């Protein structure tokens, strides 16, 4: 019974993250939605790691690596957004065409 609740929560977080990532026009909101997706993946990793083999910590250790990557993204992402804002005076995704040239 608990497994279904955790998987529904994870699917709900993942769906909100994907929906927000697709529909957001603001870079900060897109970064927040990406964090939701990574957290949903972490919940699944820990849940299935405990379900299949509770003696080994492979899923837990892998989720720690995903958390470290998310922390790096949370540190570098806003710096990139603030740099784009200083140059373009906007954080809208559709107005950012720095890589098109």
UniProtKB/Swiss-Prot annotation:
**UniProt GO cellular component terms:** chloroplast thylakoid membrane; NADH dehydrogenase complex
| Domain of life of the organism encoding this protein | Eukaryota
The protein's location, in the record's own words, is: Plastid, Chloroplast thylakoid membrane
Please provide the Gene Ontology terms (biological process) for this protein.
ATP synthesis coupled electron transport; photosynthesis, light reaction
Q: Which UniProt keywords apply?
A: Chloroplast, Membrane, NAD, NADP, Plastid, Plastoquinone, Quinone, Thylakoid, Translocase, Transmembrane, Transmembrane helix, Transport
Q: How does it sit in the membrane?
A: Multi-pass membrane protein
Q: Which family does it belong to?
A: Belongs to the complex I subunit 4L family.
The name this protein carries in UniProt is NAD(P)H-quinone oxidoreductase subunit 4L, chloroplastic
Q: Which gene encodes it?
A: ndhE
């Amino acid at each position: 019974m608990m497994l279904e609740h955790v998987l529904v929560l994870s699917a709900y977080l993942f769906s909100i993250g994907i929906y927000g990532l697709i529909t957001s026009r603001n870079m900060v909101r897109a970064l927040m939605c990406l964090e939701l997706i990574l957290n949903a993946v972490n919940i699944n990793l820990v849940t299935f790691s405990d379900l299949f083999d509770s003696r080994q910590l492979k899923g837990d250790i892998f989720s720690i690596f995903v958390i470290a990557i998310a922390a790096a993204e949370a540190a570098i992402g806003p710096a990139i957004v603030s740099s784009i804002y200083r140059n373009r005076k906007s954080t809208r995704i559709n107005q950012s065409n720095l890589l098109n040239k």
